Regions:
Chain A
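A short pre-motif secondary-structure segment
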Residues: 121-125
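Hydrophobic-face residues of short alpha-helical interaction/recognition segments
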Residues: 18, 22, 47, 60, ...
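C-terminal edge and immediately downstream basic/flexible tail or linker adjoining helix-turn-helix-like DNA-binding
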Residues: 1-8, 79-82, 137-140, 154-172
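Structural recognition of an alpha-helix C-terminal capping motif at a helix-to-coil junction
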Residues: 34-41, 54-66
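Internal acidic/polar
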Residues: 78-107, 112, 131, 170-171
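A short, charge-rich alpha-helical start-of-domain segment used by transcription regulators
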Residues: 1-20, 36, 44
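Short, aromatic/basic-enriched loop-to-helix "N-cap" motif that marks the start
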Residues: 48-62, 77-80, 143
Length: 172, 322
């Protein structure tokens, strides 16, 4: 039985990565924090579901990935989407928005703007550094589908990032 | 910086601290008793509103009664639509619990509006139908295209409008009327909080009047009754209290309260959450340190990147300001 201080050690190691992963799904930091908080509590409560021999990193990623998808299906998310379409907010131009975006930001924002299915595999492949076979298992889709989505994702990114030299795109 | 900018996840040290501290607090406080029954005032207010509403809208209704067919509450056709949208996401013929909950929220606002005798005009229904159909022309990567959806539902364009578009449009138009009516009940309240307050009233109404129907649909679509949503925690200092909402900011020192403006403190600590002001201790004051249990975000404010809105399960004061 995992003790709270042991969970703290796990959180120390994985939290930032998991918040980032959730963010790439839901594209909102506060919601990403909520998702990770929720996942840790579920993980603590359902420890029997986690097999020691499995890799903890992959297991937590799967929980975050599933919880993020639940959020994207939720009433709240859909309502916020509709509200934003119907009542577009006036954006306050802040000084930091005027600063030229660096290449890394351009790449990451281009990934954030990808369609869901391509975005999801790109995140796991490049940021989580998961092999195709593991992504297929995580998302319960065939390996060939993962490869197709990766290829399509890279094509879309190339269009968006014509003036950016991202080695991933150069070598594909 | 907008919320959807990768730069917000550059430095996550504050976020990490918040998440870790909230998780530990949550686990340590498990043994505490659950709070007393919630929403007694909301229910009373709802009953009162319904009584007044019944009188006022009965006459109003007579003039507005339409020839249109009124769709049933808990219309299974809408569930079928959700099922297809979910199948697109999960690749299986399985309805997510989250979608079933969406369905209940949607139906509850309709049932609640009906109970208040809010009846849309044909013009309002047509407008809602146009809006609903236009929705399908927007790109949304979490759902199929319109043509793909027609294939999945095995209907023609006309069939979709008749079987899905019109009933949904009628309901959309009805709950537009409910939102308008709620502006009088909740004046000067931010939109996400007001929406949430009305949704709670509506859901209470649905559960009271359609309990058996809901149970039967749950069984048919194999939806677990247990609420899988965890209760999350936000700790912090109360920096503002309004009639129906209060603002909590994490990381604020007692010495900072009153010395800096609320905006300055929100910017400095890069967070700020408005919660609905329901079922809270009467002594709640600005400067109190509190712990709020919530389930989810209910909205955000693009003009203020650090501000968001959450629902509330319960809250307690950890340390009073004086």
């Amino acid at each position: 039985m995992l003790l709270i201080h042991e969970l703290e050690r796990i959180m120390e190691q994985h939290t930032e990565r998991l918040i980032r992963l959730a963010f790439y799904y839901v594209r909102d930091l506060q919601s990403a924090e909520d998702i990770v908080q929720d996942v840790y509590i579920k993980f603590y409560d359902n420890q029997q579901n986690y097999e020691e021999r499995g890799e903890l990193k992959a297991y937590l990623s799967k929980l975050v990935s599933n919880r993020s998808k639940d959020y994207l299906r939720s009433w709240t998310y859909r309502k916020i989407q509709v509200q934003q379409k119907i009542f577009p907010q006036q954006t306050v131009m802040r000084r930091d928005m005027l600063v030229q975006q660096d290449e890394r930001t351009l790449i990451e924002n281009a990934i954030l703007a990808l369609p869901f299915k391509q975005r999801e595999v790109i995140i796991h492949f490049y940021f989580e550094e998961m092999p195709v076979i593991d992504i297929a298992e995580l998302l319960t889709i065939p390996e060939s589908t993962v490869k197709t989505r990766l290829r399509r994702g890279r094509e879309l990114l190339k269009l968006q990032l014509q003036h950016v030299e991202w080695e991933v795109l150069l070598h594909e | 910086m907008s919320k959807m900018d990768a730069r917000v996840v550059r430095d996550l040290s504050e976020s990490k601290k918040r998440v870790m501290s909230n998780v530990v607090q949550h686990l340590q406080q498990r043994h505490e008793k659950k709070s007393a029954k919630r929403w007694p005032y909301g229910v009373l207010a709802m009953i009162l509103s319904v009584c007044i509403g019944l009188f006022i809208y009965q006459q109003y209704n007579e003039q507005q009664q339409q020839a249109s067919t009124i769709p049933p509450v808990l219309d299974e056709r809408i569930l079928e639509l959700y099922l297809q949208l979910d199948s697109f996401m999960n690749g299986k013929n399985r309805l997510y619990k989250a979608s079933f909950d969406n369905f209940l929220y949607f139906e509850s606002t309709f049932a609640y509006a009906q109970s208040k005798k809010l009846v849309p005009t044909q013009e309002q229904i047509d407008k809602a139908l146009k809006q609903f159909m236009e929705e399908w022309s927007y790109e949304d990567d979490t759902r199929p295209t319109y043509d793909k959806l027609l294939q999945m539902l095995q209907v023609t364009n006309e069939g979709f409008i008749e079987n899905f578009g019109k009933p949904i449009a009628y309901k959309m138009a009805t709950f537009d009327l409910l939102w308008e009516a709620s502006q009088a009940d909740y004046k000067d309240v931010s939109s996400p909080i007001r929406t949430w307050l009305v949704e709670q009233e509506a859901m209470n109404y649905l559960e009271q009047h359609y309990h058996k129907d809901i149970a039967s649909l749950r069984e048919k679509y194999k939806i677990p009754e247990k609420d899988s949503q965890m209760k999350l925690i936000r700790s912090g200092t109360v920096l503002a209290i309004k009639e129906h909402e209060f603002l909590v900011v994490s990381g604020v020192l007692a010495s900072e309260v009153g010395q800096k403006s609320v905006d300055e403190l929100v910017q400095k600590h890069s967070n700020g959450t408005w919660f609905p002001l329901v079922d809270i201790p009467q002594t709640l004051s600005v400067g109190d340190r509190v712990e709020v249990q919530y389930r989810q975000s209910i909205g955000n404010d693009d003009a203020q990147p650090f501000i968001d809105y959450k629902d509330i399960v319960e809250m307690k004061i950890i340390k009073e300001s004086h």
